[in-house]
Amino acid sequence: MKIVIYFFLMFIVCFSCSKEQSLQMFPKPVENRKDLNNRFYQIDTLLIDTTLNTTFEGNMGVHNNQLYFIDRLFCTLHFFDSTGQICFQTLGIGRGPTETTIGQIYTHTFLSNGYLCLQGTTDDIHMFTPGYKIDYSKSYRKNRKRYRLGDPIGYDQFELYSMGYPLVCRSYKNSVFTNNRAEDPTFNYFETPDVFVQEFRNITEQRLDKKQTGRLLGRGMPDLYKGNSDTHYIFSSTFFDIDNDGNFYITYMADSLIYKYDKDYFPLYSFGFEGKSMDKNYESIHTVEEIHTKGILQYKTKGYYTWLEYIPELNYILRSYSKSKQEISDGLQIYENNVLIADIDVPKGFRPIGYIEPYLFSDAILNQDKMRMYVYRLKIK
């Protein structure tokens, strides 16, 4: 009987793997539409109140119709109204009821129930109530198995991956999701590109209700990345967001398409157009040393997609992109129901973070030397 059960389970596993391999994980657009009517838009700069005590290391976000800045080194959370004036500050380093011992905040996200999830540079996850009191009953450390270099490890094992860069963290129900990167010497896009583009898992799920790592989602990379690891390694990161129904919207730094998957990560369709005036003539990288020299310098000179944000209030998908060194602006695409309705010029560094009526806001532009913090806000009529 045990033998029968064993072979039955092996059949299910093999069938599931075969089914996944047979899926077209990166479908081509069946219908790609744009409706670029003349829309009036206005962009201005909003200076953020910097009387707060901050390291100017962190990110801006939108939560409950307020702007906030989370300081990753001081572990503080500052809320502002839509005019940039400070409302209140909470969190901090320590063992008090509204403090954390996480060390440094690597990433964070708010859940639909109002909880705040912090992830540290180690494997710690700290959960805070809507009143910003730490909830130790829901906090935990990720269980990461140890293995030595050369030990066999599957491509679908959590231990093979670290959190991506630029880092994305999203939530849906009782799970949070982060993008991945793989830097193991036996498995990475630079040194083992042929295997990587077939087997790379794009996203890791953390099951907060079970305090454990969940699914590794997405298998492989779009065709654009096949055979191009020398030029596309620097531009291989995954950006994504999740809508109210749990559907995933995925884009890659060098790929013009946006891929939609359901909550089980079944591929649905793709859409999207190339941004304007993007210089995608990437330079070849042949050594690890070149990655850290002329490789990363291309972030300032080449065209690539820099962020993707779903705006539930408007049912918009926003995708920002860098154009080139020669251009004086970056770009922002706005999609509604998969249709490109706007592709506009925005200031350099514009990355969308959310909406407070009537403005779309960018992430913070930080100037530590001048002790200044500001955001761009975009109004479309």
Name each model-derived stretch.
Residues 2-8:
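Sec-dependent signal peptide recognition
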Residues 10-17:
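Hydrophobic h-region of N-terminal signal peptides that target proteins for export
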Residues 17-381:
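Eukaryotic scaffold repeat domains enriched in small/polar residues
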